[in-house]
Curated annotation (Swiss-Prot):
InterPro entries: Velvet, Velvet_dom, Velvet_dom_sf. It comes from Chaetomium globosum (strain ATCC 6205 / CBS 148.51 / DSM 1962 / NBRC 6347 / NRRL 1970). It is found in: Nucleus; Cytoplasm. Pfam families: Velvet (PF11754). Signal peptide: none annotated. This is Velvet complex subunit B. Component of the heterotrimeric velvet complex composed of laeA, veA and velB; VeA acting as a bridging protein between laeA and velB. Component of the velvet transcription factor complex that controls sexual/asexual developmental ratio in response to light, promoting sexual development in the darkness while stimulating asexual sporulation under illumination. The velvet complex acts as a global regulator for secondary metabolite gene expression and is required for the production of chaetoglobosin A. Residues 1-173 form the Velvet domain. The gene is velB. Residues 200-220, 234-295, 341-396 are annotated as: Disordered. Keywords: Cytoplasm, Nucleus, Sporulation, Transcription, Transcription regulation.
Amino acid sequence: MSTLGQGDFELAVRQQPKYACVAIERKPIDPPPIVQLMVNPRKDPGRTFLQNPYLILTARLIRKGDEDQDEQTGPKESDLTGTLVSSLYSLKDTDNSQGGFFVFGDLSVRRVGTYRLAFILYELRLAEKECWLLSRTVSDPFVVYATKTFPGLAESTFLTRSFSDQGVRLRLRKDSRTVSTKKRTISQADQIRASQGIHGYLPHDANHDLSPNGHSPHHLRRLSSLHDQAQLDRSRSYYSESPQMRPGEYTSSSYGYAPYDDQKPHKRARMDGASPDSPHPSSAGGGGGGYETDTTAYHSYAHHAHHSGPRTVPDALGSIYPLTTSGYAVAPQPALTGLPMPSPYASMPRLDTTHLPPHSPAGAPGSASSAFSPGTIGSSSRRSPPGTAGGYPSYAGHAHAGQAMFTSQPTSLPYHPAVAHGHPGAGGLGIAVGLDLDERH
C-alpha cells in the first residue's frame, strides 16, 4: 500500500441518507449510509486494499449548502451521535462482485434541520505513527424531523438486506412503520381507517363534543348496545344448554329445584309416581292430573322457579310418597297385620295420634298408609304454583282405584320393639301395624 497515494482512492456514496428523527429516542438515520471505496485498477491490480485493516472512514455533520464550513458556524460535534467511525468491509455487491464498503448503521442527529454528512477517509500508518487523509466525499441533504412530525422508518433496502445477510450488524425492517402519536391529524386517521376498511362510530367534525372521559355520546350508546347484545348472547347460550321444557311436561325446575338436582345421588321424588324408566309422567285415566293449559303463565313461572334457587319439599309431601334408597317414590301399599313395614315407612313423620284399627282388611279406608287424597286437588283444571292449596299433581295411574286406598284422615304408625312381636333377631325398632294404643304399654 505504500505505492498508493492520495489521488488513488475514490469514495462513492452507494446509499444516501434520506431523513432522520431527532435523537431523543435514539432514532437512526434512515436508510443507513453506505460508502464504497474504489481504487485505480492500474495502481492496485490485485485489489490488495480490500484486506487493509488500517483504512477507516469518519462521518461528520455539516449544513445543507456547506461542504467546507467553519467549525464555529456549523453544527456542533455533539449534534451527531452514534458510531461515527467505520472500518472497511469486504463484501459482495448486488451484482455479485467483490468490493470494499463502509457502513454506518448507528448514526443519530440531535437537532432538527436539514444537513449533510461529510465522509473522510484516513489511513493509519503505525510505523510512522501518523494518520494520512486519503479522500473525502459528501452525502446528499437529508431532513431531521421532530418526534411529532416524523413520518416513520421505511422498509429496509435490498442493499441493506444483502449486507446484513453477509454479517454486517444492521437493523432490518420488513415493512414501513408509522408513528402513533396522540395528536395525529384527522386526514391521517381517516386514511388509516379507509386503508383498513374500518368505519369509525365517532364523527369527525369541528362541532363534535366529547364527554369528559373521552367518548362521545353516540359512541357511548354504541358501547351500551354492544354490552346488551353480549348479555343477550350469554343468556341464549345458558338457556340453550338447559333442559328444554314443553307444555304439559314437568321437570325438577318447575317445582323450584335446581336443574341439575336430578343427577345427585338423593333424587327428588317424582310428583306423578311414574316408574324410573319412564321419562314422562303417565297420562292414563281421566282428568290428566290437572295440567296447566296456559303456556305463557307456565313458562314465566318455570323461569322464575329456575332462578330462585333450590327449595325444600313440604313435610306433608314427604308423607304422601316416601323415598327409597334409590331415590324414587314408592306407590302406597296396604298394611299387613303381623309383618314389619318396609324401612322407608319407619321414617314417616307422625302427624297426630290417630292409629289404624286392628285387623283392618286390605283395601279398607282405615288401612291405607297414606293421608293424601287425589280427589281434593284434581278437581281444578288449572295448576296453582307450589306452596298453595292443591299445588301438586295427582297420580293419574291410580285414578281407577278410587277412594279405596286413601283416607281423608291423617294416620300414623306407632313404634314398637321388634322383640315384642316375635322378631328376636332384629336389632332396632319395629313397627306394629293394626295395634291399639293401649297395647303399647
